[in-house]
UniProtKB/Swiss-Prot annotation:
Any one GO molecular function term: ATP binding
This protein's name: Thymidylate kinase
Keyword Zinc: no
A family per Pfam: Thymidylate_kin
Organism phylogeny: Bacteria, Bacillati, Bacillota, Bacilli, Lactobacillales
Organism whose genome encodes this protein: Streptococcus pyogenes serotype M49 (strain NZ131)
Positions bound to ATP: 11-18
Classification via CDD domains: TMPK
Keywords: ATP-binding, Kinase, Nucleotide biosynthesis, Nucleotide-binding, Transferase
EC number: 2.7.4.9
């Protein structure tokens, strides 16, 4: 039985969501007694991390969109049963850096795969599990890619090599999802100063936990 809460963090490449999460968690631990788990997709457990390497390898430019989607789904399933569900059943507050919405935005809007197929596969992999809250960090594609290019410490992966048109379609996909699920997905302007972005994210998380 799930007694914990699931919060997912989403955004186009360069939105800074991972950095926000790193700063958000210590602040949250000062305010709640609940155990907190942070993890990521694809990855989080050994099998899923191996799949992550396959997906992001810059040499795998021939990867078919359906192959890409199925790899993400496989990584999601393993991560869920091995790490996420046990934590939720233990009553923990779980943060995942990317989850089901990424598939709709990237492989759906970005790659042009059918939304219905993606939703069915997500349902199959998660047994219908949905986040209690999704923090979507929005940033224009031009700004996001500029941030990536300016970050000398960030390792470039296969998805970073995509055209700006694909990144723009991904963003449009996210915005459509936010409009479709306004109660679950909150949109946060990630062009604002980092401290302000973290503060807004914290407010939304606390609102969920104190509701």
């Amino acid at each position: 039985m799930i007694t914990g809460k699931l919060i997912t963090v989403e955004g186009p490449d360069g939105a800074g969501k991972t950095t926000v999460l790193e700063q958000l968690i210590p602040l949250l631990k000062q305010k709640v007694a609940q155990d907190i788990l942070t993890t990521r997709e694809p990855g989080g457990v050994a099998i899923s991390e191996h799949i992550r390497e396959l997906i992001l390898d810059i040499n795998h430019t021939a990867m078919d969109p359906k192959t890409e989607l199925l790899l993400y789904i496989a990584a999601r399933r393993q991560h869920l049963v091995e790490k996420v569900l046990p934590a939720l059943e233990a009553g923990q507050l779980v943060f995942i850096d990317r989850f089901i919405d990424s598939s709709v935005a990237y492989q759906g809007a970005g790659r042009g795969l059918t939304k219905a197929d993606i939703q069915w596969l997500n349902e199959f992999a998660t047994d219908g599990l949905e986040p209690d809250l999704t923090l979507y960090f929005d940033v224009p594609s031009e700004i996001g890619l500029a941030r990536i290019n300016a970050n000398q410490q960030r390792e470039i992966n296969r998805l970073d090599l995509e055209t700006i048109e694909i990144h723009q379609r991904v963003r449009k996909g996210y915005l459509a999802l936010a409009k479709e699920h306004p109660k679950r997905i909150v949109t946060i302007d990630a062009t604002k100063p980092l401290k302000e972005v973290v503060s807004v994210a914290l407010e939304h998380v606390l609102a969920l936990l104190l509701a």
